Amino acid sequence: MKRMKRSVSLIGLICLAGFLALAGCAHHGQKTLTGSVEETQILLNFLENERDYFHKGGSFVIGAPDLRTNLLTKPQAQYVIDIRSPGDFAKGHIRGAKNVAFADVYNHVKQINAQSYERIVVVDYSGQASAYAVSLLRAAGYANAISLKWGMSSWAEQFAKDSWLKNLGSARMAAFAQTPSPQKNPKGQLPRLATGKTNAKEILEARLNTLFAEGFRPVMVTDGCVFNAWYCGSSYYVVNYWPTELYQKVGHIPGAVNYTPQETPFKSSTHLLTLSTNGANVLYCFTGQTSSYTSGYLRLLGYDARSLLFGANAMVYDRMKENKVPNTFIPQTEIMNYDFVS
């Protein structure tokens, strides 16, 4: 009998220990949900009501012809930042451009008299990383920041060979669907930010520092990953950022949800809250430039937003040409072959 009581007591202790362990795990699990929606709401209110660069900031790109004209007629009013690697910069760059690593761009701009320039032009290989950088700079209050459309690929063929010309493709034409859009997610909550700040400008500053330090790599995703998400170890909420008529006419990635630009879908009053907060949101446009710019805005708010590299040009290029879709990369008209220095 004593032995039985001892056994029961032992079992009870084991059960109690197990219960406490589970309780401890549950408590630990709650801690992984760091940050708060309130922080995000403070930042969102600021970006929508006081510094709405994303919806009201105008075009974020400048074409090579306009940049060249500005450099010839008013060179002192242009400040060009080239974020390509030092090695590629040395092989050729726009005269007067400063070579700055992506992670250092924000601090670099802080150290110049930014408001004395008409334009702060950010340049990269293809216009995608530069569009992302410009989105962050405009959020910081540098409304004169702008991205060179198509990057150095538009300046001379030498640069396009290893960038845009190398990434045009039509391999996904047969896989593209021409069905109506699936429904958007039901509206949920904002992501949680954990800067520890309570003031909008301080929260924004913390987010800017984090995103510039991370660089563009976490934003990039290829069509190979989107079509074979299992291979990349991810599941994606795919956002097609096109007008509805082109969503069906040109076709779309199967399962992609149409967020038409005309609806300003990334406002809190429209469809912002339908984006996923549990996984990655992959945005794609025609070129990868608008989706990169948009990803900058969404990542500031804590969304895991990613941009599909080179957009539809990398997937259904021939169909884009056939349908004369805007922002199709046409080498004969988009590559200017301007002079450069090395």
What is the predicted function of each stretch?
Residues K2-G12:
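Bacterial N-terminal signal peptides that target proteins for export
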Residues G12-A21:
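Bacterial N-terminal signal peptides
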Residues C25-I62, A90-R119, Q128-V221, E245-A280, ...:
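Rhodanese-like catalytic fold shared by cysteine-dependent sulfurtransferases
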Residues L67, Y79-R84, A97-V100, Y237-N240, ...:
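Short hydrophobic beta-strand that contains or immediately precedes a catalytic carboxylate
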Residues R68-Q76, F227-G233:
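A short acidic-Thr-Gly-centered motif at the start of a beta-strand
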Residues Y79, R119-V121, Y237, A280:
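Structural motif
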Residues V123-D124, Y284:
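Short, surface-exposed ligand- or partner-binding patches at beta-edge/loop junctions that are enriched
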